[in-house]
């Protein structure tokens, strides 16, 4: 039995929730998110709370209910506060700059790299070595950050590359002669 699914999700003021079968739409100040859930999950709205439970006779229904509850909680946080990921570029000549709806990156390749941003994700470059991504969908913001990081993941010897601001890159010792 999922302990996560047993806790209800509180709906703060200013957030609108629409339930349509297994589809849930949450609208808030930062945007609107829609998601369809597994049909083994029963979602009910009571006053300012959403409750989750399993449908009878469905295998792994408690696990699905716990997953649904966690996803809905992230949707509520996303439309009220939003999510932020910060990337830091480390290396000689590594730079980032905004180019319209894309992030332009100079990463030591023979060509500049441009990463197009999907709808719902905004980026800003407070300095040439920082990228701040914001959006209301946690999964999309995290995926864009991972895609940008994958162009030049931090290497373990000098630590050059793109890393998350809170990431700790373990460094290796150089080979001895």
From Swiss-Prot:
The keyword DNA-binding does not apply. InterPro entries: Ribosomal_uL6-like, Ribosomal_uL6-like_a/b-dom_sf, Ribosomal_uL6_a/b-dom, Ribosomal_uL6_bac-type, Ribosomal_uL6_CS. Keywords: Ribonucleoprotein, Ribosomal protein, RNA-binding, rRNA-binding. Pfam families: Ribosomal_L6. Gene3D superfamilies: Ribosomal protein L6, alpha-beta domain. One of its GO terms (molecular function) is rRNA binding. GO terms for cellular component: cytosolic large ribosomal subunit. The keyword Ribosomal protein applies. One of its GO terms (biological process) is cytoplasmic translation. PROSITE patterns: RIBOSOMAL_L6_1. Part of the 50S ribosomal subunit. Belongs to the universal ribosomal protein uL6 family. HAMAP family: Ribosomal_uL6_B. This protein binds to the 23S rRNA, and is important in its secondary structure. It is located near the subunit interface in the base of the L7/L12 stalk, and near the tRNA binding site of the peptidyltransferase center. This is Large ribosomal subunit protein uL6. It comes from Vibrio cholerae serotype O1 (strain ATCC 39315 / El Tor Inaba N16961).
